[in-house]
């Protein structure tokens, strides 16, 4: 599995060239993309500026001497490469398993090209088997939790080391055990209207390309948006 992730990450780095502003994703597959960008800077003299999607990726990039700017210092991002937890046939996805969904969506939005790198196990017919992360402000989080409970969404606060997990933006994450999401776009809009919700892990029709590593090699699928 790790080898497949590495294949996808290295392939994605081929979409990066000199002079670009590059969004560096977060997660186990995006990790290999960041490593490859670091290698190309060191060995090939690649010249780019990067923005990161989490404190974890910032630390990795700094260790590789990748030049960084904050998202507020750039007008746009040429290409962002990130992982995904699930991807359906309509190019909708669930992200946020690593807890960085808000920053990931902030960086993805001004990106001219948005690419996901995944192994073939992440491809699904319908989203929802992977718990959907919802980032909520700490104030009133229990109210949001009870709202989800009443709606039958089987919520649980994400925890780490026996404490509630706190994101880089100092928010909590409520994971929803939905089993299947029949209409991701409508459900995303529903979550957008819940007061106290900062962002959710549904990335609907945002991605341009999905690079999939599997037993038969690396395949690249292009969405309608990316054509």
From Swiss-Prot:
Substrate binds at residues 26-29, 82-85, 95-98, 122. It is an enzyme of class 5 (isomerase). Pathway: Carbohydrate degradation; pentose phosphate pathway; D-ribose 5-phosphate from D-ribulose 5-phosphate (non-oxidative stage): step 1/1. The active site is at residue 104. InterPro entries: NagB/RpiA_transferase-like (IPR037171), Ribose-5P_isomerase (IPR050262), Ribose5P_isomerase_typA_subgr (IPR020672), Ribose5P_isomerase_type_A (IPR004788). Its EC number is 5.3.1.6. It holds the Pfam family Rib_5-P_isom_A. It catalyses: aldehydo-D-ribose 5-phosphate = D-ribulose 5-phosphate. One of its GO terms (biological process) is pentose-phosphate shunt, non-oxidative branch. One of its GO terms (molecular function) is ribose-5-phosphate isomerase activity. Keywords: Isomerase. Catalyzes the reversible conversion of ribose-5-phosphate to ribulose 5-phosphate. Belongs to the ribose 5-phosphate isomerase family. Homodimer. This is Ribose-5-phosphate isomerase A. It comes from Streptococcus pneumoniae serotype 2 (strain D39 / NCTC 7466).
